[in-house]
Protein backbone atom coordinates (compact mmCIF):
# COMPACT_ATOMS: atom_id res chain seq x y z
CA UNK A 1 0.00 0.00 0.00
CA UNK A 2 1.00 3.63 -0.50
CA UNK A 3 0.63 6.34 2.12
CA UNK A 4 0.33 9.82 0.60
CA UNK A 5 0.92 12.81 2.88
CA UNK A 6 0.13 16.39 1.86
CA UNK A 7 1.32 19.04 4.31
CA UNK A 8 -0.72 22.18 3.77
CA UNK A 9 -0.67 25.46 5.66
CA UNK A 10 -3.76 24.56 7.71
CA UNK A 11 -4.09 20.77 7.51
CA UNK A 12 -2.07 17.66 6.81
CA UNK A 13 -4.04 15.35 4.54
CA UNK A 14 -3.21 11.65 4.51
CA UNK A 15 -4.49 9.07 2.08
CA UNK A 16 -3.89 5.34 2.03
CA UNK A 17 -4.01 3.65 -1.37
CA UNK A 18 -4.22 -0.07 -2.01
CA UNK A 19 -2.13 -1.91 -4.59
CA UNK A 20 -5.07 -1.49 -7.00
CA UNK A 21 -4.78 2.30 -6.68
CA UNK A 22 -8.07 2.59 -4.78
CA UNK A 23 -8.27 5.04 -1.88
CA UNK A 24 -8.72 3.12 1.39
CA UNK A 25 -8.96 6.10 3.72
CA UNK A 26 -8.56 9.86 3.68
CA UNK A 27 -7.90 11.72 6.92
CA UNK A 28 -6.78 15.15 8.09
CA UNK A 29 -4.61 16.39 10.93
CA UNK A 30 -3.94 19.96 12.02
CA UNK A 31 -0.71 21.45 10.72
CA UNK A 32 1.28 21.99 13.90
CA UNK A 33 4.82 23.32 13.60
CA UNK A 34 5.67 22.26 17.15
CA UNK A 35 5.18 18.51 16.73
CA UNK A 36 8.14 16.19 16.97
CA UNK A 37 8.70 13.17 14.74
CA UNK A 38 7.54 10.94 17.61
CA UNK A 39 4.28 12.87 17.97
CA UNK A 40 3.69 12.66 14.22
CA UNK A 41 4.32 8.89 14.36
CA UNK A 42 1.70 8.54 17.11
CA UNK A 43 -0.79 10.60 15.08
CA UNK A 44 -0.23 8.42 12.01
CA UNK A 45 -0.47 5.19 14.02
CA UNK A 46 -3.76 6.42 15.49
CA UNK A 47 -5.13 7.08 12.00
CA UNK A 48 -4.27 3.54 10.92
CA UNK A 49 -5.98 2.17 14.03
CA UNK A 50 -9.02 4.41 13.52
CA UNK A 51 -9.51 3.18 9.95
CA UNK A 52 -8.61 -0.47 10.75
CA UNK A 53 -5.45 -0.75 8.69
CA UNK A 54 -1.94 -1.82 9.63
CA UNK A 55 0.89 0.62 8.98
CA UNK A 56 3.15 -2.43 8.66
CA UNK A 57 1.39 -3.19 5.36
CA UNK A 58 2.48 0.11 3.80
CA UNK A 59 5.27 -0.45 1.29
CA UNK A 60 5.84 3.14 0.13
CA UNK A 61 5.05 6.72 1.03
CA UNK A 62 5.08 10.02 -0.79
CA UNK A 63 5.26 13.47 0.77
CA UNK A 64 4.09 16.75 -0.72
CA UNK A 65 4.54 19.89 1.36
CA UNK A 66 4.15 23.65 1.22
CA UNK A 67 5.41 23.99 4.81
CA UNK A 68 9.21 23.52 4.70
CA UNK A 69 9.67 23.72 8.50
CA UNK A 70 7.67 20.48 8.88
CA UNK A 71 9.38 18.50 6.12
CA UNK A 72 12.25 17.17 8.21
CA UNK A 73 10.03 15.98 11.06
CA UNK A 74 7.53 14.34 8.70
CA UNK A 75 10.29 12.63 6.71
CA UNK A 76 11.81 11.39 9.96
CA UNK A 77 8.41 10.16 11.22
CA UNK A 78 7.57 8.33 7.98
CA UNK A 79 11.02 6.74 7.87
CA UNK A 80 10.72 5.58 11.48
CA UNK A 81 7.16 4.28 11.05
CA UNK A 82 7.56 2.60 7.65
CA UNK A 83 11.23 1.63 7.65
CA UNK A 84 12.21 3.68 4.61
CA UNK A 85 12.11 7.35 3.61
CA UNK A 86 9.26 8.81 1.59
CA UNK A 87 9.54 10.07 -1.96
CA UNK A 88 9.40 13.86 -1.58
CA UNK A 89 7.67 15.78 -4.36
CA UNK A 90 9.97 18.57 -5.48
CA UNK A 91 12.66 19.54 -7.96
CA UNK A 92 14.31 16.48 -9.45
CA UNK A 93 11.40 14.08 -8.94
CA UNK A 94 10.29 12.63 -12.27
CA UNK A 95 6.55 13.24 -12.69
CA UNK A 96 6.20 13.35 -16.46
CA UNK A 97 5.03 16.95 -16.18
CA UNK A 98 6.65 19.51 -18.48
CA UNK A 99 6.86 22.87 -16.73
CA UNK A 100 6.94 25.79 -19.15
CA UNK A 101 8.23 28.46 -16.79
CA UNK A 102 11.55 30.29 -16.58
CA UNK A 103 12.27 29.09 -13.03
CA UNK A 104 10.78 25.61 -12.80
CA UNK A 105 11.97 25.07 -9.23
CA UNK A 106 9.63 27.83 -8.04
CA UNK A 107 6.55 25.75 -8.86
CA UNK A 108 5.24 24.44 -5.55
CA UNK A 109 5.01 20.73 -4.80
CA UNK A 110 1.25 21.11 -4.30
CA UNK A 111 0.83 22.58 -7.77
CA UNK A 112 2.88 19.77 -9.33
CA UNK A 113 0.84 17.16 -7.44
CA UNK A 114 -2.45 18.79 -8.52
CA UNK A 115 -1.35 18.81 -12.16
CA UNK A 116 -0.12 15.21 -12.17
CA UNK A 117 -3.30 14.02 -10.44
CA UNK A 118 -5.48 15.90 -12.94
CA UNK A 119 -3.56 14.36 -15.85
CA UNK A 120 -4.16 10.88 -14.43
CA UNK A 121 -7.91 11.51 -14.41
CA UNK A 122 -8.57 13.80 -17.38
CA UNK A 123 -7.30 14.66 -20.85
CA UNK A 124 -5.56 18.02 -21.38
CA UNK A 125 -6.24 20.88 -21.69
CA UNK A 126 -7.12 21.12 -18.00
CA UNK A 127 -7.60 23.92 -15.48
CA UNK A 128 -6.93 22.91 -11.87
CA UNK A 129 -8.29 24.76 -8.85
CA UNK A 130 -7.08 23.97 -5.34
CA UNK A 131 -8.93 25.88 -2.63
CA UNK A 132 -6.94 25.72 0.59
CA UNK A 133 -5.40 28.42 2.74
CA UNK A 134 -4.30 29.78 -0.63
CA UNK A 135 -6.26 29.20 -3.82
CA UNK A 136 -4.17 28.02 -6.76
CA UNK A 137 -5.31 27.86 -10.35
CA UNK A 138 -3.18 26.00 -12.87
CA UNK A 139 -3.31 25.58 -16.64
CA UNK A 140 -2.17 22.33 -18.24
CA UNK A 141 -2.00 22.04 -22.02
CA UNK A 142 -1.50 19.14 -24.40
CA UNK A 143 1.77 17.31 -23.98
CA UNK A 144 1.45 17.23 -20.16
CA UNK A 145 2.67 20.85 -20.08
CA UNK A 146 2.09 23.10 -17.08
CA UNK A 147 1.73 26.56 -18.63
CA UNK A 148 1.43 28.58 -15.44
CA UNK A 149 -1.17 29.67 -12.97
CA UNK A 150 -2.35 31.99 -10.27
CA UNK A 151 -1.84 32.08 -6.53
CA UNK A 152 -4.62 33.86 -4.64
CA UNK A 153 -5.67 34.25 -1.02
CA UNK A 154 -7.93 31.39 0.04
CA UNK A 155 -11.61 31.86 0.83
CA UNK A 156 -11.13 32.05 4.61
CA UNK A 157 -8.11 34.34 4.34
CA UNK A 158 -10.11 36.65 2.06
CA UNK A 159 -13.13 36.67 4.39
CA UNK A 160 -10.94 37.42 7.41
CA UNK A 161 -9.23 40.29 5.58
CA UNK A 162 -12.54 41.77 4.42
CA UNK A 163 -14.10 41.67 7.87
CA UNK A 164 -11.02 43.35 9.38
CA UNK A 165 -10.69 46.04 6.71
CA UNK A 166 -14.29 46.79 5.71
CA UNK A 167 -16.19 48.53 8.50
CA UNK A 168 -19.64 47.25 7.54
CA UNK A 169 -18.71 43.65 6.76
CA UNK A 170 -18.97 41.50 9.88
CA UNK A 171 -17.02 38.28 10.30
CA UNK A 172 -19.01 35.22 9.27
Over which residues does each language-model region extend?
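Short glycine-aspartate micro-motif
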Residues: 2-6, 62, 126-130
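Glycine-rich phosphate-binding loops at beta-strand->alpha-helix junctions
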Residues: 11, 35, 64-71
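Short glycine-rich phosphate-binding loop at a beta-alpha junction
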Residues: 55-66, 85-87
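Short glycine-rich, Thr/Ser-proximal phosphate-binding strand/loop in the N-terminal lobe
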Residues: 2-44, 143-166
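Phosphate/pyrophosphate-binding loops at sites that engage ATP/ADP/AMP, CoA/4′-phosphopantetheine
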Residues: 44-60
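N-terminal/domain-start alpha-helical segments
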Residues: 68-73, 77-80
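Phosphate-binding/catalytic loop of phosphoryl-transfer enzymes
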Residues: 76, 84-87, 93, 97-165
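Catalytic phosphate-donor-binding core of small-molecule kinases
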Residues: 168-172
Amino acid sequence: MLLAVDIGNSTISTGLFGLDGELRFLASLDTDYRKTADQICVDLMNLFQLYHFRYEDVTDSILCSVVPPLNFMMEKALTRLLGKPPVVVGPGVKTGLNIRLAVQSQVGADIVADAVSALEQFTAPIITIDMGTATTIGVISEGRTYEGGLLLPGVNVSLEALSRRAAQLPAI
